[in-house]
Amino acid sequence: MLELVYEEIEEKMGKTLEVFKNDLKKVRTGRASLALLDGIVVDYYGTPTPLNQLASLSVPESRLIVIQPWDATAIKDVEKAILQANIDLTPSNDGKVIRLSIPPLTEDRRKEIAKRVNQMAEEHKVAMRNIRRDANETLKQMKKDGDISEDESFAGKDKVQKVTDGYIERIDEVFKAKEKEILEL
């Protein structure tokens, strides 16, 4: 019975950590990364199509992303989708390929981005704490229903707290690494 509670919080906290890592991939750091283009959907002949299914994406230099649509007629649609994606990059189009030049970030912009990443980390920590609260409520209800003893309830809450602390520590580690990446010139 308790194992189900532990498995559930491990699963939920693991997913929360993965979501945080995926969210961080979309944060600009001054270096070109194809992750910036994740989630961009192009209206291709009336069908919403992910950009990576319409074009060849590459990073030939550290500050340049090159997008080469397989269908040259879709280049305007791709350009429009990039502009609508609000990734703070302006595409330049030569008729065959689209180039996204990543400008170097100013010190103020770096600090602003680091602050935003910190907020994201805090939001995910709150999500972890909510998962912990739900697990503790479940344990309390199980004790009340007589499914577990008081000792098992305390031991369960202790284990839930340790798991929560571990995941919050992982979020902090991921955040620190991303912050370092953002702030380095």
Swiss-Prot record:
Q: Where is the signal peptide?
A: none
The family note in this entry says:
Belongs to the RRF family.
Top-rank taxon, per record: Bacteria
Where is it located? Cytoplasm
Q: Which CDD domains match?
A: RRF (cd00520)
Name the SUPFAM superfamilies for this protein. Ribosome recycling factor, RRF (SSF55194)
**What is the stated purpose of this protein?**
Responsible for the release of ribosomes from messenger RNA at the termination of protein biosynthesis. May increase the efficiency of translation by recycling ribosomes from one round of translation to another.
Q: Which GO terms describe its biological process?
A: translational termination
In its UniProt record, a GO molecular function of this protein is:
ribosomal large subunit binding
- Supply the source organism's classification: Bacteria, Pseudomonadati, Thermodesulfobacteriota, Desulfobacteria, Desulfobacterales
UniProt keyword annotations, A-Z:
Cytoplasm, Protein biosynthesis
What Gene Ontology terms describe where this protein resides (cellular component)?
Answer: cytoplasm
Task: List the source organism.
Answer: Desulfosudis oleivorans (strain DSM 6200 / JCM 39069 / Hxd3)
Name this polypeptide is given: Ribosome-recycling factor
Does this UniProt record's set of keywords contain tRNA-binding?
no
HAMAP family in UniProt: RRF
